[in-house]
Amino acid sequence: MRCPFCGHDDTQVKDSRPTEDNSAIRRRRSCPECGSRFTTFERVQIRDLVVIKKDGGRSPFDRDKVLKSLRIALRKRPVDDEQIERIVNGIHRRLESMGENEVPSKFIGELVMEVLMDLDKVAYVRYASVYRNFREAKDFEDFLGKMVVPRLD
């Protein structure tokens, strides 16, 4: 595998093990040229998913995009990287199990919202603020008003 730091074509695998949920193989690699170390993941790909965007455009499903958006929403929250990886794997498996090759971006966003609602309410609101394009404080207020949580009195 090519080194992402110097571009050298031949890197060495130093450690290889399954992820916690056995959905991928995690490999630690090092580059003999520049000495950099990095991690790669090997996953099964059942089908090539295509995302249908709001404007009608189509692009290949990018699990890293989902991973990045979850990491942003969950920044400084009590959720570790392994748990985030499991969430992304679960979303990806759910999309593949639908049997459809094309999936609307809105559906992916709703899946992420569903997971975050159960996992962490703060991350849920953070994600919703970007996903639903909040522009002002009133948008947050309206959204939070719909999230009424019963109080214990």
From Swiss-Prot:
Domain of life: Bacteria
Region annotation (Disordered) ranges: 1-26
One Gene Ontology term from the biological process aspect of the record: negative regulation of DNA-templated transcription
Keywords annotated in UniProt: ATP-binding, DNA-binding, Metal-binding, Nucleotide-binding, Repressor, Transcription, Transcription regulation, Zinc, Zinc-finger
Cofactor note: Binds 1 zinc ion.
GO MF entries: ATP binding; DNA binding; zinc ion binding
Compositional bias annotation for Basic and acidic residues: 7-24
Cofactor list: Zn(2+)
Transmembrane segments: none
ZnF start-end (unnamed): 3-34
Residue ranges of every copy of the ATP-cone domain listed in the record: 49-139
PANTHER family in the record: TRANSCRIPTIONAL REPRESSOR NRDR
Family: Belongs to the NrdR family.
NCBIfam families attached to this UniProt entry: transcriptional regulator NrdR
Function: Negatively regulates transcription of bacterial ribonucleotide reductase nrd genes and operons by binding to NrdR-boxes.
The protein's name in its UniProt record: Transcriptional repressor NrdR 3
Source species: Paramagnetospirillum magneticum (strain ATCC 700264 / AMB-1)
